[in-house]
Regions:
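Short S/T/G/P-rich N-terminal loop/turn motif that feeds into the first structured element of a domain
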Residues: 1-57, 64-74, 97-104
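C-terminal structural segments of small proteins and small subunits
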Residues: 70, 78-94
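A generic structural signal for ordered secondary structure
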Residues: 60-63, 85
């Protein structure tokens, strides 16, 4: 029997309208991200949209469990950080479970 640890992710698509205020959010979100075991996989680096639409910044965080990912988003610490983001950007955020099925 194969035991696999399927990871869980936040995928955030963000358009930043106020970079200085967004930096305050990026500083504030470190507290809940650390508390819930988040690890940045992408954080607004180089990208090229090859099909469809995305916002200008894509952030992917990995969490140790789906429950941890949701708990982080719903935490009072993240709620405080989110208030800083809301005035500085528009974001679409999804919590996703990794895939452990058959691969090509």
């Amino acid at each position: 029997m194969r035991v696999v640890d399927v990871q869980r992710y936040w995928v955030a698509n963000v358009d930043i309208s106020n970079p200085d205020e967004y930096k305050k959010y990026a500083t504030a979100n470190a507290v809940p991200f650390r508390k819930y075991g988040a690890k940045f996989l992408t954080r607004g680096g180089k990208s090229e949209m090859v099909e469809g639409k995305l916002r200008s910044r894509v952030v992917v965080l990995e969490f140790p469990s789906f429950e941890a990912a949701l708990a982080c988003y719903r935490s009072p610490e993240y709620a405080a950080a989110k208030k800083l983001r809301e005035g500085a950007s528009v974001a679409d955020i999804a919590v996703l479970e990794g895939y452990d099925g058959q691969q090509p």
